Regions:
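Conserved beta-strand-loop-short alpha-helix elements that form
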Residues: 224
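N-terminal amphipathic/basic-hydrophobic helices that include classical n-h-c signal peptides
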Residues: 1-10
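Active-site region of the double-stranded beta-helix
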Residues: 10-25, 29-33, 48-221, 229-253
């Protein structure tokens, strides 16, 4: 894995300041033992940097984005019980004479949220200053392009069924608690064109079995998942807000 060598050669615990907020391991150890190989759970007390992640995105910031920033699709998705809802259910026009037709309607969004839907704020590395800065620093340390989404889930709800991503993921738990069930890959190191939907039956069958890891993330905890690892996540008895940082893989394909 090329990144492992890059991390070992270029990074130390002093220079990898963004990475040290997401993994409780020295860069060389992370590169050799976990990157692209195995999940890594890091509890809040083990991580460097500020306590928690509310400096990057807080519940109040989510409220501001939804209600005061004129957010448009595709910067918001809404999902419930494994299904992504049509944008027409929560968007509308920008007012008389305006050509905008996809502006987020916060009252409709909150109606769906109250009915158990998960709100997915997408592309925050482009629109929210603290995450613009953090993503730029982490991307420079990893030497990889990345993206940042946020997931706000009501108590006891699950937005997506078991699936895998075709990019590596850092999960940063901001608020509330969320239970993650993680299973080994059905396809090792999937490429971007090898999305989980093409193996839906195999993914579902594997997801119904005993997980390789079953953990509850609390505020300030972080979880690293290599691409291809199956996962599902369910909010516990309070709402859950977490950040997902997706790191794209650079391959010859």
């Amino acid at each position: 894995i090329q990144l492992a060598g890059n991390l070992i050669h270029f990074m130390t615990s002093e220079t990898a300041t963004a990475l040290s907020r997401a993994v409780a391991a020295e860069p060389a150890k992370f590169a050799e033992a976990f990157w692209g190989r195995a999940p890594l759970l890091s509890r809040a007390g083990e991580l460097a940097g500020p306590a928690g992640f509310t400096d990057l995105l807080s519940p109040a910031a989510v409220d501001e984005l939804l209600s005061r920033r004129g957010l448009r699709t595709p910067f918001l998705r809404v999902a419930r019980q494994g299904t992504v809802l049509p944008a027409s259910q929560f968007t509308g026009g920008g007012g008389a004479g305006a050509e905008i037709t996809d502006q987020v309607l916060d009252d409709q969004v909150m109606r769906l949220y109250a009915d158990g839907a998960t709100l997915v704020l997408q592309g925050l590395h482009r629109i929210w200053p603290p995450l613009i800065d953090y993503a730029r620093q982490l991307g420079a340390e990893l030497r990889r392009p990345l993206q940042v989404n946020a997931y706000l889930t009501p108590p006891g709800s699950q937005g997506f069924s078991t699936h895998y991503d075709t990019h590596d993921v850092f999960v940063l738990q901001v608020d509330g608690t969320k239970r993650w069930r993680i299973h080994a890959p059905v396809l090792a190191d999937p490429l971007e064109k090898q999305a989980w939907g093409g193996r839906a039956d195999e993914v579902a069958a594997t997801g119904a079995g005993e997980p390789a890891m079953d953990v509850v993330l609390a505020p300030g905890d972080a979880l690293y998942l290599p691409r291809g690892w199956l996962h599902s996540a369910e909010a516990q008895d309070t709402r859950s807000l977490h950040l997902t940082i997706g790191v794209r893989s650079l391959t010859r394909y």
